[in-house]
From Swiss-Prot:
GO biological process: proteolysis
Stated name of the protein: Carboxypeptidase Y homolog A
Organism: Sclerotinia sclerotiorum (strain ATCC 18683 / 1980 / Ss-1)
A GO cellular-component term linked to this record: fungal-type vacuole
Reaction catalysed by this enzyme: Release of a C-terminal amino acid with broad specificity
Cysteine pairings via disulfide bonds: 186-426, 320-334, 344-367, 351-360, 389-396
Domain of life: Eukaryota
Positions of the propeptide removed during maturation: 18-132
Amino acid sequence: MKLLASTVLMGAAAASIAPQQQVLKNPFQSASKPISEAWSKSMESLNHLTDSMKDMTSEAKAVWDEVSTLFPEAMDRATFFQQPKPHTRKPDTAWDYVVKGADIQNVWVENSKGEKEREIDGKLEKYNMRAKKVDPTKLGVDKVKQYSGYLDDEENDKHLFYWFFESRNDPKNDPVVLWLNGGPGCSSLTGLFLELGPASIDKNGKLHNNPYSWNANASVIFLDQPVNVGYSYSGGSVSNTIAAGKDVYALLTLFFKQFPEYAKQDFHIAGESYAGHYIPVFTHEILSHKKRNINLKSVLIGNGLTDGLTQYEHYRPMACGEGGYPAVLDSSECKAMDNALPRCQSLIQSCYDSESVWSCVPASIYCNNAMMGPYQRTGQNVYDIRGKCEDSSNLCYSALGWISDYLNQAAVQKELGVEVSSYDSCNFDINRNFLFQGDWMQPFHRLVPDILEQIPVLIYAGDADFICNWLGNQAWTEALEWPGQKGFNAAKTKDLQLENGHKTGTFKSSGNFTFARIFGAGHMVPMDQPEASLDFLNKWLNDYTL
């Protein structure tokens, strides 16, 4: 879960502001300096920052001025970093396994030319990974073999929590899937218990088996990232997707080194919502290392935010009755969104051209207000156009509160080796920080063509979602410039159906690229259509076709 709606309205978005950021012309070469060092000082007021805005477009500066005028006190008091979570680190002796990145870094082998080279690429010396065996009988989430633990970045005091479930079927041969929720700032453990994991939790805290769990035929890693999300913690912060990608590569490298029995299996990355940002970057990071122990075969993105310039154009059609469901907005509101679109697209284009915080933040603020705000103000569920938001304190879903209650139980945290004092399903500070580093509108879709040259990509979308709707996802896949674009756009749409012939959606595919529309599902497809989601997952993992 989820692309958070917290930053849709300007009041929420203006809760914080970031200092000047270097232009991310080549982000994969600019992230070498620790984020916590680069962003270690509190914010200056917006009035002070305007001295540095000389290179901004007039449109972008106007948005900054609007926010400053409406929320001057919030801007003056803004602080970029949240307080670290209270935590107590356990000694290494408390864990069943400890693997040190420095040990992996120091392994040298002889290549075919007789030259010495590192066995595995990457700067791993600052990373360690700790793991413990989870007793399935104590928690009762599933009967399969499980591990939980932390990836530690010792240099930057970052600690990412993960929970691994072995396949219920044939773990020695079944693939491994990394699952990522979005937000940014939402725990992947919400995906575990709300969507695709082995069990769900009711209002009484009772566990219920999920027969459509994604570990039916695959082992699954649920990862709380970036730091300070879920059970993860840090004394600093990660506030952009690029920095998070380095951590994920390190985690997977150390995990497969410690558990080589899974390293030979096919590996896939899947996620939803803001994972539409995460997955292209994380995949690019993995594929950039030619000597690796990660057998990456494909990626899957569900209801993602990937190409804002294309996707934001489709909020008005979805809200106004052109996405297969009745209109939520009246004609005057739809017209206002039409009128706002050119300015929104101009701001996003400026962000794409410069990749600078000064262009990307105004684009996010203006477009979120103009293109999402009218819908959100109706009280309709932004994650499912078919109904109202029933529990605003839990992002419209009461089950999120039940999950938090369960994961805050001392017995649960003890069995998992948790080192923080509390669990929250979503960290809104992370969401704010990513927004005000300009990450929200970064053009990470530009990485997809290179990925398509190497591995298959599946984009799927529940057709009742508003916030990352199927119209926008279909549009960006068709707009993507890559060698196979013409063939993909000309491909025939086919029915997606279960073995019994029941139609669950449609899809189109060409080369390594596939787009699927899932009927009757909102933002969280595995929750709304569990049988259909497991069916297309199994088909995809089998031969990358639906």
